[in-house]
Amino acid sequence: MKRIEEEWNIEKIESMSTDEIFAKLNRLGIPVTPDDYRAAAQRHESGERLSEEWRAKYTLHPEGRYDEDFVWMAAIVLWKRLVPDRISFEQIDDLMQEGYKRLQSGQTAAACDAWWQVWKLIRDKVTPERNTLQALDRDFLGMQSVFNWCQDFEMELRNAGRDDPTYHRICISYCQEFLVAFSDEVLRK
């Protein structure tokens, strides 16, 4: 009896060594090395976007039904290992989702603490070319849009501030920083 092929997932790829990941990528027709990866990462803010570059440049030779998924997931896993000093959009999204989990479990202040870190990371991704929420969302590709998350964060800071006024002060700082980061967008409205 033929065994059903298993799908790839991030956890399965995380359990592989870096050498095993590169060997698999090479077998799939993506002849990259760790140095190639690091160089490509300088042109991108996300592992998924980096994998799109590979797919445009190389012809994929899948060994199995789900190997196309391996490519983008491997790029995300390799980012954490090979470019630990640069936070990717996927890592920001992971922290954002952690905040939503905390919120769903009734931990509003803990969610806001995680999201304050998310905000600092997002703020650092704003550039002259990426200075609107629309432009940021175009690159972000997270589970939530940055546009929606910004509203959730502001609302939950106010909610957390009911129990601890520190969160009202954080909310004021967040709103001020938001206006500076997205000043072009604010002025256009």
Residue ranges and their predicted role:
Residues M1-Q91, L95:
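Helical anchoring/docking segments at protein termini
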Residues L25-G29, I122, F153, L157-G161:
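Generic structural signal for hydrophobic core residues of well-folded globular domains
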